[in-house]
Amino acid sequence: MLLLEGNDMWVNLKTSFVDIDELLLFLKGQKFSGYLHFEFSDSQCALFLQLGDVVNGLVALEEERNVGSRAVKRILVRSRQDKGGTIKVTQLPLQNMQFLSEAYGLSVRMLHKNLSSKYSNLSEFLEKLQYESFSGCIEVWFPVDDRHGIIFLEDGLTTAIMTEELLVDLKEGTASQLKFAESFINRAQRSGVQYNAFVEN
């Protein structure tokens, strides 16, 4: 699961020790903007907060990504019951959290796994998805430097691209945004990336 890097306030908190309700109440009082990243034995999850309020949740299983209020409820129940999980609390600027929460707006399931740009050209694959009015995301892995990225699509159009360092909103389609998208895709193709395609549920 890919999230933006930020200011890690707490790391490796144990769900066996931390009361998630008390933690969220404290963060609400602080008008905290950022996310809580949970790691469990079979999944990774995140709660997205803006000014102390939980606005979205993400449950990442091997072949699906679930978001929204049901994901939030699932995460809260799991963190109360599963004593083997860990939590990281990361602070981000409010605008970054607004972008991040919006980017993870669709629940998706895996459609194609372990594709390689060496054998399946990424640009041509994206053109095919555009023709099909595809909604979902492409998770990209750069094997050379072990970095990750995500290309978000709605109705065939690329709406955002995210790496660990930045999230670029492409909805306005300005010249600089389109140039960034083209540069990212070209770099991914040259780097021989591996990628998975997830389609909207």
Question: What are these model-derived regions, one by one?
Answer:
Residues 1-201:
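Acidic, Ser/Thr/Pro-enriched low-complexity segments and adjacent helix/loop capping patches
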